[in-house]
């Protein structure tokens, strides 16, 4: 007669408990054996012996955030295209039409971003105004 849990479940529970116990032991040893220093220099950043000057908070233009978002959006297309490429024979013409539609939507988005100036890094005075 088997108990409520199978032997595999007991092994999994033992594994999780062991991992948690190992983490707690390592955290506890670090707390007990770690040195403590209190003072004004404790909260200063370490700069290889050089005294830091100025603020560490730099302001980045919004363009960097825009480029990061565009990279994420257009970078997501690669796994989809790869999955289509490895299964092109199984998908047939229906898969080809779907991928063609997907790529055309991405290209339309890219042309739109170019038209509104999201990809233009030139200074404001040299920018070309979009035609309406």
UniProtKB/Swiss-Prot annotation:
Function of the molecule: NDH-1 shuttles electrons from NADH, via FMN and iron-sulfur (Fe-S) centers, to quinones in the respiratory chain. The immediate electron acceptor for the enzyme in this species is believed to be ubiquinone. Couples the redox reaction to proton translocation (for every two electrons transferred, four hydrogen ions are translocated across the cytoplasmic membrane), and thus conserves the redox energy in a proton gradient.
Reaction(s) the record says it catalyses: a quinone + NADH + 5 H(+)(in) = a quinol + NAD(+) + 4 H(+)(out)
Topological type in the membrane: Multi-pass membrane protein
Primary enzyme class: translocase
Quaternary structure, from the entry: NDH-1 is composed of 13 different subunits. Subunits NuoA, H, J, K, L, M, N constitute the membrane sector of the complex.
Enzyme Commission no: 7.1.1.-
Keyword tags: Cell inner membrane, Cell membrane, Membrane, NAD, Quinone, Translocase, Transmembrane, Transmembrane helix, Transport, Ubiquinone
Organism phylogeny: Bacteria, Pseudomonadati, Pseudomonadota, Gammaproteobacteria, Pseudomonadales
Domain of life: Bacteria
GO cellular component term, pick one: NADH dehydrogenase complex
Chief site of localization: membrane
Organism: Pseudomonas paraeruginosa (strain DSM 24068 / PA7) (Pseudomonas aeruginosa (strain PA7))
Places the protein is found: Cell inner membrane
Family: Belongs to the complex I subunit 3 family.
GO MF annotations, alphabetized: NADH dehydrogenase (ubiquinone) activity; NADH:ubiquinone reductase (non-electrogenic) activity; quinone binding
InterPro entries hit by this protein: NAD(P)H_OxRDtase_bac/plastid (IPR023043), NADH_UbQ/plastoQ_OxRdtase_su3 (IPR000440), NDAH_ubi_oxred_su3_sf (IPR038430)
Annotated protein name in UniProt: NADH-quinone oxidoreductase subunit A 2
Membrane-spanning intervals of the chain: 9-29, 66-86, 93-113
Gene designation: nuoA2
């Amino acid at each position: 007669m088997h108990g409520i849990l199978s032997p595999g479940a007991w092994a999994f529970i033992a594994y999780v408990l062991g991992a948690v116990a190992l983490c707690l032991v390592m955290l506890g040893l670090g707390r007990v054996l770690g040195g403590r220093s209190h003072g004004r220099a404790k909260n200063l950043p370490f700069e290889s012996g050089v005294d830091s000057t100025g603020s560490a908070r730099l302001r980045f233009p919004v363009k960097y955030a825009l480029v990061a978002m565009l990279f994420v959006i257009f970078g997501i297309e690669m796994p989809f295209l790869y999955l289509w490429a490895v299964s092109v024979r199984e998908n047939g013409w229906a898969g080809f039409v779907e991928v063609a539609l997907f790529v055309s939507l991405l290209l339309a988005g890219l042309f739109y971003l170019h038209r509104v100036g999201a990809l233009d890094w030139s200074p404001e005075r040299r920018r070309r105004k979009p035609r309406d």
